[in-house]
Amino acid sequence: MDPRISSRLRALALLVFVISITDGIPNRAKRSSSEINAEIDGLIQQLTTVDADTKGIQETLTELKTTVSANPSRISQVSAVVKSVGSSLAKFKTGDPYNIVSGCLDILSSIATTYNGPYGVGLGAVASLLSSVIGLFAQDGFKNSLKSIVDEAFKRYRDEELQGQLKGASRTFNDVIGTLKNLTDKDTAVTDLEFSLATSSVSVSQFSNMLGIIESRINTGSTTTDLAEAKRTVDFIFLYLELAVMRETLLTQLILFTKKLGKFENYANGISASIDANKQAVHDTILFLHQMEPKNAVCGAYYYPVHHSDVSEGIFTFTRYFGLPDPPRNTFQGVYRVENRYWPAWHICKESYMGNHMFRGCSYIKSAGVHISALDNGYLKLNLKGKNMYITKHAQGWAWGTADNDPGEQGYFIFVPLKSGYYMISTKKWPNYFVYMESSASGYIRSWHNNPGLQGHWKLT
C-alpha cells in the first residue's frame, strides 16, 4: 500500500461523541490486570440483563481479560475501552433506541480516541468490539436508530423541508450499514461483484443535502435575537452533529470493508478525503460556539454553561471530535474583579441605602471583589458583601442584592465567553437580557435587551 495512503487512512477517526477518556482518570497505567478483569466480570454480568443483543460485546470483553493478563502493557488502553462500556450501560438498560445508539457511539468514540481510529486498532479483541457495536445498528431491534434520533429532535419543532430529507436518508442508513457489516464479517473472500454492490449502495455524498439544509439553519440562527429561534438553533446543532457522525459511520464501515479486500487503495483514499472534507465543513459551521462574537450571544446563552443540559453536554463532546478549541475553562470559584470593557478602570461593586442593595460601577482600587461560585445546575451566583446579585428587566431593571441564599433564576448567571476574552453576562430567567454598566455618574449595573455593546462586556481578573 502506498505509504501516503496508509498514513491518511490511519488518521481516519471513527466517529461521534468524542470523549477524552484520559481526562480525570488518575494513575490508570498503575491499575492491575486483576482489577481490570474484576471490572470486566461485573460488566459482563450486567450486560446479560440488557434488553438488547450484547453477546458480541460480552465475548469481546472476555477476550480482553485474556489480553491484559498476557500483556500488562495493554492495561491502560483496555481500561479506557472498558470504562466506556461501563459508562454506556445506563443507556443500554433504558431500552430506548435513542439512548442505545448514543451508548454505542460512546464506545466507538473511545476506541477511536484510544487507538487512533480503525486503522490504529492493534488488538483483535478491540476490533471485534468495534464490529459488534457497529452491528447493533443493523439488528432488527434497532432498524429505526436514525429515525429515533430524528424524532427526538423534532418533538417540539416542525420543519417540513428538513423532515423530508431526513426520511429519505433514514430509509437507506440501516440497510446499507447492515449489508456492509455482513460482508465485512464474512469468513470467505469478498467477490468483485459483492464489492461492486456494496460500494454502489453507499454514496460518499450520503446525507450531504440534508446536512447542507441544517447548516443553513444554523448559520441563520447563530445570530438571532429571538429566544425561541436561539434555542431551536442549539437543538439543531445537536442534531446536525449526530447526523454528521452517522454519515461517517457508514463511510468508516466502507473503509473497513475495503481494507479487508487488501486492494482498491485509491478508492479508500477517496472516501478518507470525503470524510476529511465533511469534518472541516462541520468544524467551520459550529466554530462560533467556542469563538463567539457579540452577535452570537443569545445563542450562546443557551449553549452555556456547557454542562447545564444534556444537549449542551452532547454538543461539547462532539466539538472535540470536529477539532474545535475548548472554550475558556475558568472554574469561577473565588473572588474576582469584574471589570468593564468600555471603562477599563471601573468594575462591579455594591452600595446600600435604607435597606436596599444595588450593584454599580466603582473606580476605586480597594473596593471588594465579587465572589463567584458555581451552582449545582452549572449556573453562577454572584455575591458581594453577603448579598447575592439578581437582575430585573423592566424599565428600571437594575442589579439588586438579596440576603437570600437562593436568588432565583434572575440570579442564576450565564457567562458567555467571547472571542475577545471578555464575557457577556445574562441569566437563566432572561437569556437575552445582558448585564451592562449605564453611562451615568453612578454607573449602575442594569440589564439590556440583546447586545449592550462594550458597556456589557466584562473581564474577570
From Swiss-Prot:
GO terms for biological process: killing of cells of another organism. Belongs to the jellyfish toxin family. Type II subfamily. One of its GO terms (cellular component) is extracellular region. One of its GO terms (molecular function) is toxin activity. The fraction containing this toxin and CfTX-B shows potent hemolytic activity. This fraction causes minor effects on the cardiovascular system of anesthetized rats (at 25 ug/kg), since it has no significant effects on heart rate but produces relatively small increases in mean arterial pressure. Keywords: Cleavage on pair of basic residues, Cytolysis, Disulfide bond, Hemolysis, Membrane, Nematocyst, Secreted, Signal, Target cell membrane, Target membrane, Toxin. This is Toxin CfTX-B. Oligomer. Residues 1-24 form the signal peptide.
